[in-house]
Amino acid sequence: MKITAIIPARYASTRFEGKALADIMGKPMVQHVYERTAKASLVSEVIVATDDERIAAAVHAFGGRAEMTSRVHETGTDRLAEVAARLDSDIIVNVQGDEPLIEPAMIDEAIKPLAEDSSVMMGTLKTRIKTLHDFLSPNVVKVVTDWEGYALYFSRSPLPNFRDKWNDLKDEAFASRKLLCYKHVGLYVYRRDFLLQFAQMSPTYLEMAEKLEQLRVLENGYRIKVVETDYESIGVDTPGDLEKVLERLKK
């Protein structure tokens, strides 16, 4: 079984232009993501998908593989699918290009359900919410699942909505596991053919309302396997986030 991890990386970014090439202890951020992804035991190969020659050149400079893509893609999934269509891989992993601290074990955790069960078309991760701030924040995507670990819904709103427990919503309640709530970790695994099918689906109502692309899958009647992980990463959206990464690496 051939499993390819693809890292979409753009140069243009509203909040942090050129972040894929931001220096982190002597290496561009995309190199950190690439090298950590390559350490996942289930990954056969790693490819950076980019629309910018500067990023491609940086990847080639450290010996990595980069594939050029169109500049007109509206989503990272479209960029992913363009590259996946050129490959003969069985499974495609979408690793965010702005997570230089991603744990290789997280990637393996997300891949495992698809590697073991041919009926699983798509998978992702969740981790426990530990603070009230994260539970209430629209920037933290929440997920609820059924007893078999398949997603019921993703939302920027609090999930679940504790009708009779608002007075119990305190940090200690989340930390003590009195309230079990989960945030979505944006790492996706697809069967290649399903990814290409997904990219052809039209945007859906709930997807556009929540601005969450994965809802398109649920609205079209497909299932997403969600695996719980104890690992957490830091997404770099701003220069301030980059400082947090540097602080953690120095410890």
UniProtKB/Swiss-Prot annotation:
InterPro entries: Cytidylyl_trans, KdsB, Nucleotide-diphossugar_trans. Coiled coil: none annotated. It holds the Pfam family CTP_transf_3. It is an enzyme of class 2 (transferase). Keywords: Cytoplasm, Lipopolysaccharide biosynthesis, Nucleotidyltransferase, Transferase. GO terms for cellular component: cytosol. GO terms for molecular function: 3-deoxy-manno-octulosonate cytidylyltransferase activity. It catalyses: 3-deoxy-alpha-D-manno-oct-2-ulosonate + CTP = CMP-3-deoxy-beta-D-manno-octulosonate + diphosphate. PANTHER family: 3-DEOXY-MANNO-OCTULOSONATE CYTIDYLYLTRANSFERASE (PTHR42866), 3-DEOXY-MANNO-OCTULOSONATE CYTIDYLYLTRANSFERASE, MITOCHONDRIAL (PTHR42866:SF2). Belongs to the KdsB family. This is 3-deoxy-manno-octulosonate cytidylyltransferase. The gene is kdsB.
